[in-house]
Curated annotation (Swiss-Prot):
It comes from Prosthecochloris aestuarii (strain DSM 271 / SK 413). This is Small ribosomal subunit protein bS16. GO terms for molecular function: structural constituent of ribosome. InterPro entries: Ribosomal_bS16, Ribosomal_bS16_dom_sf. Belongs to the bacterial ribosomal protein bS16 family. Keywords: Ribonucleoprotein, Ribosomal protein. GO terms for biological process: translation. GO terms for cellular component: cytoplasm; small ribosomal subunit. HAMAP family: Ribosomal_bS16. SUPFAM superfamilies: Ribosomal protein S16. It comes from the Bacteria.
Length: 135
């Protein structure tokens, strides 16, 4: 069985993962069939590059993505786009749906960043209040 999974590369404490199509019996960093993307978790923000045509090919011939690889494919919107194609939507509908999806994702990211900033500020204020009351 062919799996779409991550293959670790990079150096110590600075991982870079290649998204590969590999035989399920092969070791994690061992023999693989094809490199179909790259994931850099240490970049800010993390970056995912994927060759969409090759991923569609491998999924089309029955390759199964691992849980982590599937979440990365979902984060890029590739699985959503393939689902729209499978439902028989026209190319214009797919393009408009993907644009809406992209807007929702960017809004979600902005919301997360705002929550993170609020929490950071609240923590800073609490520490300042604790320092002031300690004096």
């Amino acid at each position: 069985m062919v799996k779409i999974r991550l293959r670790r590369a990079g150096r110590k404490k600075m991982p870079v993962y290649q998204i590969v199509a590999a035989d399920a019996r092969a070791p994690r960093d061992g023999k693989f069939l094809e490199v179909i993307g790259r994931y850099q978790p240490t970049a800010k923000p993390h970056s995912i590059t994927i060759d969409k045509e090759r991923v569609e090919y491998w999924l089309g011939v029955g390759a199964q993505p691992t849980t982590t690889a599937q979440s990365l494919l979902r984060a890029t919107g590739l699985l959503y786009e393939m689902n729209l194609k499978r439902k028989g939507r026209s190319e214009e509908e797919i393009v408009s749906e993907m644009a809406q999806w992209q807007e929702r994702q960017s809004a979600r990211l902005q919301k997360r960043l705002a929550v993170k900033a609020r929490r950071r500020q609240a923590k800073k204020d609490a520490q300042a209040a604790a320092a002031a009351s300690a004096e």
